[in-house]
């Protein structure tokens, strides 16, 4: 398959060998410093892997710290041999930077995030979800049920990603879900996807009442705002940033992003 590649740049014209990761960092650091008119103080590779069907192209997901800036910025770069490109398109003219994401780090598959399934299952699924996201409400409860019915096939790792700007009620609901998750109470965690309360509700007491009405379980404010719950939410947000996730639900199968959100179904028993 021939790919249209834009902005291909030779790292060093006299080099004949492939670009090393160190060489890539050096070039990108100098290039971005000139472009941003600010020094890049740190650059690291978050994830990299060969792109199937591209005859040797690899994708690098980079994180860069800029002098004077609190937040790191991300950059997607493609390499092949001694070439570097900021743009690579597939046969249908889609930008690979729009259809690829970093691989899930192995450390994310830990016991505290294993919601259902066997940790030694053939396939690992990781989901980032918001209980008030309409697509999440449609997809995620079914995903949980499918994994629960096929524990030897799948292990489902659940991360919370409340979209607070559009669903402020998700803050309280997500905190309650973390409590249910820690208790191993999958049923009531799923119930939080169908609460009779506005997604725009900002009063925690109103949302907690909706949770009690739906589940029969009373959760106190002091429980949802504990240091432990705060740490868990902060940890989940870090993964969102690492994986360059921008919306929900975002699903990864065996480490790779599944933009269809249904890729796991091909492994279900017929």
What annotation goes with each model-predicted range?
Residues 19-86, 200, 209-270:
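C-terminal cap of thioredoxin/glutaredoxin-like
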Residues 55-57, 72, 111, 120, ...:
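Extracytoplasmic
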Residues 111-115, 129-134:
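Non-cytosolic head/periplasmic domains of membrane-anchored proteins
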Residues 80-108:
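A short, surface-exposed interaction/processing loop segment used at functional sites
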Residues 126-131, 137-215, 241-247:
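Structural alpha/beta surface segment adjacent to cysteine/selenocysteine redox centers
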Residues 118-121, 132, 248, 260:
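Mature, Sec-exported extracytoplasmic domains of Gram-positive
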Residues 106-123, 148:
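A short beta-strand-turn-helix
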Residues 4-14:
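Sec-dependent N-terminal signal peptides
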């Amino acid at each position: 398959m021939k790919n249209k590649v834009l902005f291909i740049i030779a790292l060093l014209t006299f080099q004949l060998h492939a670009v090393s990761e160190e060489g890539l960092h050096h070039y990108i650091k100098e290039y971005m410093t000139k472009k941003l008119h600010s020094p890049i103080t740190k650059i690291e590779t978050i994830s990299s892997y060969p792109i199937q069907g591209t005859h040797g192209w690899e994708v690098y997901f980079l994180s860069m710290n800029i002098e004077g800036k609190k937040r790191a910025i991300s950059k997607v770069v493609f390499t092949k041999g001694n070439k570097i490109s900021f743009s690579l398109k597939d046969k249908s003219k889609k930008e690979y930077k729009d259809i690829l994401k970093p691989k899930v780090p192995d450390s994310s598959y830990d016991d505290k995030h294993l919601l259902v399934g066997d940790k030694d299952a053939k396939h690992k699924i990781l989901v980032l979800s918001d209980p008030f996201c309409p697509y999440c409400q449609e997809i995620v409860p079914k995903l949980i049920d499918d994994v629960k019915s096929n524990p030897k096939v799948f292990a489902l790792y659940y991360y919370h990603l409340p979209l607070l700007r559009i669903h402020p009620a998700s803050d309280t609901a997500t905190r309650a879900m973390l409590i249910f998750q820690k208790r191993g109470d999958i049923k009531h965690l799923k119930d939080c996807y169908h609460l009779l309360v506005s997604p725009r509700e900002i009063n925690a007491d109103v949302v907690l009442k909706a949770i009690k009405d739906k589940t029969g379980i009373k959760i106190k404010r002091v429980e949802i705002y504990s240091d432990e719950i705060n740490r868990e939410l902060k940890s989940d947000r870090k993964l969102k940033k690492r994986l360059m996730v921008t919306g929900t639900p975002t699903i990864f199968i065996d480490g790779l992003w599944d933009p269809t959100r249904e890729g796991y179904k091909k492994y279900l028993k017929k």
